[in-house]
């Protein structure tokens, strides 16, 4: 005979203060756990959204980032001649020869310097990134010292407002527009004319070449052709995969740190839940004896106390996820371990994170209630009734 579910729920309500305090402790641990997962998801989304599966990116063989790469002009011309390069509506090749440089700018709030990516793009650079759109001002004019800044850069860095001037590459550059790139990493970049930036930084090669594929499935053919060409020392990747790889080191660090903290904090929360359940068993010894005398089996007693601890864990999990969901409106910036530049992104809550967080809370509840439930199930009827 099973103990009614309403009995289990009623017992949680009887000890309102103890239940609330224990659930709050579990909720704080779940909050930390969920927030770390949201941080990792936001980072991955930002860098994955930066690339498009329809675009191919060419960098120097062995280079891990565009900053480290160098593609000579002659090699870029060979890439441009490939039949897999898509054409625009006007017959132009949808391709951009780009240069990527790191500079140091001061933040508006703290006046402390931080690295920022400067990206020189070709005439088709904007067309290759449909997620990028101008929201203020205008596009820079090719052949001039004009630049446009990502939304995050305009907000965070001094001199990056429209009409303001930044000095780098021994020149003054005027900010003529701000662009929004959705959730992508381009929001943390400054764009200008590629050839002007190459001249300003005294370079003789591009950092990368990006082009739209005529067929997204045709990547392997052009990849094999370019990487086997003896004139070239390049490597070709799908743009979305390239940027996803950029998140690996930072993502791994965040996950390890978050899991470690969650395990440490969960130990305390689990012990708290265990103390609560032991106290519940001690206070209800006579009640347990009465249930046994009425014919309820040991397994029913065990299941009732386990269910009670699981409900306690679930309550803490729901509260923790609710608190963590508020972080979706918080922006965060950190250094990208691959490029050593600042990257701005937001906390992202997904259905998977909600499920994982609730499972985590149930595990804590189960761990905290398992031993007390066994103790309750092992109580003898006579001893329990004597305690009354």
Name every feature range the model reports, one short phrase each:
Residues 278, 286-332, 356-364, 368, ...:
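Transmembrane alpha-helical interface segments in multi-pass membrane proteins
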Residues 328-355:
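Short juxtamembrane loops and helix-capping segments at transmembrane helix boundaries
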Residues 1-6:
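Short, membrane-interfacial amphipathic segments enriched in basic
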Residues 50, 86-87, 106-113, 139, ...:
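Mechanotransmission and gating elements of multispan inner-membrane complexes involved in transport
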Residues 114-156:
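Short beta-strand boundary microenvironments
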């Amino acid at each position: 005979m099973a103990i009614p579910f309403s009995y289990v729920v009623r017992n949680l309500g009887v000890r309102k203060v103890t239940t609330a305090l224990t659930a709050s402790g579990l909720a704080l641990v779940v909050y930390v756990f969920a927030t770390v997962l949201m941080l990792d998801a936001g980072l991955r989304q930002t860098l994955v959204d930066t690339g498009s599966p329809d675009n191919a990116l060419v960098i120097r063989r062995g280079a891990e980032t565009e900053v480290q790469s160098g593609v000579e002009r002659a090699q870029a011309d060979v890439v441009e001649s490939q039949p897999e390069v898509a054409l625009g509506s006007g017959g132009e090749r949808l391709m951009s020869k780009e240069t990527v440089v790191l500079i140091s700018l001061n933040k508006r709030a703290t006046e402390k310097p931080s690295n920022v990516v400067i990206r020189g793009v070709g005439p088709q650079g904007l067309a290759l990134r449909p997620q990028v759109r101008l929201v203020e001002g205008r596009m820079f004019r090719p052949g001039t010292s004009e630049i446009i800044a990502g939304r995050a850069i305009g907000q965070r860095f001094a001199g990056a407002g429209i009409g303001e001037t930044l000095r780098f590459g021994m020149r003054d550059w005027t900010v003529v527009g701000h662009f929004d790139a959705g959730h992508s990493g381009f929001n943390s970049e400054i764009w200008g004319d590629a050839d002007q930036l190459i001249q300003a930084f005294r370079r003789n090669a591009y950092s990368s070449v990006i082009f739209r594929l005529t067929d997204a499935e045709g990547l392997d053919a052009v990849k094999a052709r370019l990487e086997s060409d003896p004139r070239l020392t390049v490597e070709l990747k799908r743009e979305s995969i390239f940027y996803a790889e950029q998140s690996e080191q930072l993502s791994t660090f965040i996950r390890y740190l978050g899991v470690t903290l969650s395990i440490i904090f969960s130990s305390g929360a689990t012990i708290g839940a265990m103390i609560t359940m032991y106290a519940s068993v001690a206070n209800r010894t006579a009640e347990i004896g009465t249930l046994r005398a009425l014919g309820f089996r040991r397994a029913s007693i065990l299941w009732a106390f386990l269910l009670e601890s699981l409900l306690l864990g679930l309550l803490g999990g729901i509260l923790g996820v609710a608190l963590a969901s508020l972080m979706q409106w918080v922006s965060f910036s950190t250094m990208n371990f691959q490029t050593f530049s600042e990257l701005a992104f937001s906390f992202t809550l997904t259905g998977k994170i909600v499920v994982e967080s609730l499972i985590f809370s149930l595990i804590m509840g189960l761990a905290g209630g398992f031993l007390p439930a066994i103790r309750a199930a092992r109580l003898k009827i006579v001893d329990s009734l004597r305690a009354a």
